[in-house]
C-alpha cells in the first residue's frame, strides 16, 4: 500500500520551505560559555545585547532576545521567541517557554519553568514559576 513516508523529494521541499532568513547578532562584552547553542533567527534575528554573560550548556532558541546586563547560568533553555529584558539573572537549569518575556530586573530561581511573562522587578521560582517577592535591586 502507499502509506505516508517522507521521500527524498519531500525532505528537499521542506528544507527549502524552512530556510531561515534571520541571523544572530551578538553585542559587545558578551561572554559565551562552552557547549552553548544559539540558534539563528528564522524570520527575525536572534539578539544578544551588550554586557551579557551566558554560562555553559545554555540553549537559546530562534528569534530570542537577551537585553543588556543579564546573566544566564548553566543549563538554561530559552525557547523560541522568548525575551529576557535588561538586568536579569536566570538560575541554572531554568526553562523559559516560547513567546514569554522575563521583564527587567527579574531573578529567576534555579530549575524554574517560566510559562507566563513576568512583571518588572520580580523574584520567581518553581515549576511552574510563581512570583515570590519584589526584587528591588539585583
Give the location of each predicted region.
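Structural signal for interior beta-strand "rungs" in well-ordered beta-sheet cores
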Residues: 1-125, 129-132
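Long, low-complexity, intrinsically disordered extramembrane tails
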Residues: 136-138
Amino acid at each position: 500500500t502507499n502509506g505516508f513516508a517522507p521521500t527524498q523529494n519531500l525532505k528537499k521541499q521542506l528544507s527549502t520551505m524552512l530556510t531561515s532568513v534571520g541571523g544572530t547578532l551578538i553585542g559587545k562584552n558578551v561572554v559565551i560559555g562552552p557547549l552553548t547553542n544559539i540558534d539563528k533567527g528564522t524570520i527575525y534575528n536572534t539578539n544578544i545585547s551588550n554586557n551579557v554573560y551566558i554560562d555553559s550548556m545554555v540553549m537559546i532558541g530562534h528569534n530570542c532576545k537577551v537585553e543588556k546586563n543579564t546573566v544566564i547560568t548553566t543549563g538554561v533553555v530559552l525557547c523560541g521567541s522568548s525575551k529576557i529584558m535588561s538586568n536579569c539573572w536566570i538560575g541554572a537549569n531554568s526553562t523559559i517557554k516560547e513567546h514569554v518575556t522575563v521583564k527587567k530586573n527579574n531573578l529567576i530561581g534555579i530549575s524554574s519553568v517560566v510559562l507566563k511573562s513576568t512583571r518588572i522587578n520580580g523574584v520567581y521560582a518553581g515549576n511552574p514559576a510563581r512570583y515570590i517577592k519584589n526584587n528591588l535591586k539585583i
